[in-house]
């Protein structure tokens, strides 16, 4: 950040509207990402407190609440799930109720906090195609080490999630089929058009019949 300070004391960076792998979150470039400045101190210093607004201005820090799973549910047409969330139910509890994991009247976070940890990991990990090994790692990271699963438990969670969420799995298939079709003609740059009209480009697309891979930055 210090290296990016201009003579007028401003700091600038680029904004990528679909920069993060897998989730498509906004991101920055060149090692500076204003969309993900650490909340906690790093080596005794708060990065956020290093930023100050100009004279007569205020700085606002805003966050989109659980935007990825909300958009995923919209894109795949899971409006029953979105209906639960719109009704004021915690998103991870809504997942538990929609998939039959939780049926109690009391809020999940009060009655079954361990189950909420699992639902959070399922929503944020399995919703984006995690396999068993990766899901075990993601679940542990997302819950601060509170959720540790055996390989067998991870495999079961992956299988159950995909069986319980066929609309999400179908969306994955549609996206992959579109890229595969594009790559038949232009494997060096396959393009997917979002609902917003913005393109997402994948470079050097390879399909070995089992796995589809590509790069979001040319030459990587």
Protein language model regions, located:
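Short, amphipathic alpha-helical "recognition" segments used to contact nucleic acids or chromatin
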Residues: 118-127
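A domain-scale signal for long, ordered structural cores in large, multidomain proteins
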Residues: 109-112, 124, 137
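Extended, well-ordered alpha-helical scaffold/bundle regions in very large, multi-domain proteins
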Residues: 127-178
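Acidic, glycine-rich two-metal-ion catalytic cores of nucleic acid-processing enzymes
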Residues: 1-110, 171-220
């Amino acid at each position: 950040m210090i290296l990016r300070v201009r003579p007028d004391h401003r700091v600038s960076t680029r904004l990528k509207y679909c920069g993060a792998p897998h989730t498509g979150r906004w991101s920055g470039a060149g090692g500076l990402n204003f969309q993900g400045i650490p909340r906690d101190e790093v080596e005794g210093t708060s990065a956020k407190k290093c930023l100050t607004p100009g004279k007569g201005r205020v700085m606002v820090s805003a966050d989109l609440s659980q935007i990825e799973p909300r958009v995923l549910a919209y894109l795949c047409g899971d409006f029953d799930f979105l209906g639960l969330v719109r009704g004021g139910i915690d998103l991870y509890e809504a997942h538990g109720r929609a998939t039959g994991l939780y049926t109690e009247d009391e809020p999940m976070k009060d009655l079954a906090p361990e189950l909420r940890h699992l639902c959070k990991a399922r929503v944020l990990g399995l919703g984006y195609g995690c396999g068993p090994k990766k899901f075990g790692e993601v679940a542990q990271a997302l819950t601060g080490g509170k959720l540790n699963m055996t390989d067998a438990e991870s495999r079961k969670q992956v299988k159950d999630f995909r069986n319980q969420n066929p609309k999400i799995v179908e969306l994955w298939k549609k996206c992959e089929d579109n890229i595969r079709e594009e790559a038949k003609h232009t494997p060096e740059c396959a393009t997917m058009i979002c609902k917003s009209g913005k393109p997402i480009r994948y470079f050097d697309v390879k399909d070995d019949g089992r796995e589809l891979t590509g790069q979001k930055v040319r030459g990587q």
